[in-house]
Amino acid sequence: MSRRQVLAAGALTGAALAGSTLWAPVKASAAAAPAIFYSPHQDDEALGLAGSILEHKAAGRPVYLVLVSKGENDQLAKKMNQDPCPLTIGDSRHPCAAGGHHGLSWPTDGASMIVPARTAEFMASAKALGVDKVINFKLSDSPYNSDDNYYRFVDSVKAKIKALAKQYPGASHKFTAGWLEETDTHKALADAAYFLMNEGVLTDVRFNYVYAYDKPKSQRANGAAYVLNIPSAHMAIKRKAIYCYNTWAPDRNLYALGYHSVPDKMESAHEDPREFVFTIPSRYTPGPIKH
């Protein structure tokens, strides 16, 4: 069975490092301060944070998972309104769990149907991973089109992270490597972390390269400070989290939206039992992605 067939089958049935501990196994602290993972959008946690989440859970750490943005996406609504599935037009490799169920006639505002459905997938994924708490910032995904929009979003994210750092002293904070990920929402989250590190608010910070799965397998670890080799038992759980994004179950508000958003990333993350942890670059440059 090919990895694409495995992903389809699973979907149809399923549902700056600061410190010196990066290269050592995660150990629970005496105070059991939480490890807080930040997912810019619904699906990032399943793609590139899940193995690290499970590593911390296995070490006895409480794990809190934050959804940063609402994930509005008008193009995703348009995809779900097309029939047949646009993923299969000229490319039959993508096993879309919503096959035969397209043409939904959803409004294309990108929010009214998309946000609750994407968030339902996120919550199902979080449940599969067994996180101890889910926190939803409920920020509009709005760092685009101007520098003002971008920095307004950075400030909003920064304020919310700062509040969590105050609420949970001693927590570690895990972000995505936004400077590598070609998406302003991801970059803005990394910028917020960078500013808070410089202010001394965050002292234990790591960055997982979620979009590494776009690269050839041999290049995904390039520049990483640490490569997590995910144990097979944890990888099975990570795959269950991925399947939550390719499940057709309208009664649970699951419409396989994550798979329609990033099918290639999901296929690659499903197949590669590794995650890639980075430190923030010494010459880090804040600001939006230069396209």
What are the residue ranges of the model-derived segments?
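Active-site rim/loop-helix segments in enzyme catalytic domains that contact anionic ligands
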Residues: S29-Y168, Y194-L202
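The feature marks non-catalytic terminal segments
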Residues: A120-K133, D148-Y151, K166-Q167, E199-H291
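Short, conserved beta-strand edge motifs with alternating hydrophobic and charged residues
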Residues: F137, K174-T176, F207-V210
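Charged helix-capping and loop-helix junction motifs
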Residues: A188-Y194
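Acidic beta-strand-to-loop metal/phosphate-binding motif
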Residues: A171-E182
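Conserved alpha/beta-hydrolase "acid-adjacent" motif
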Residues: L47, D184-T185
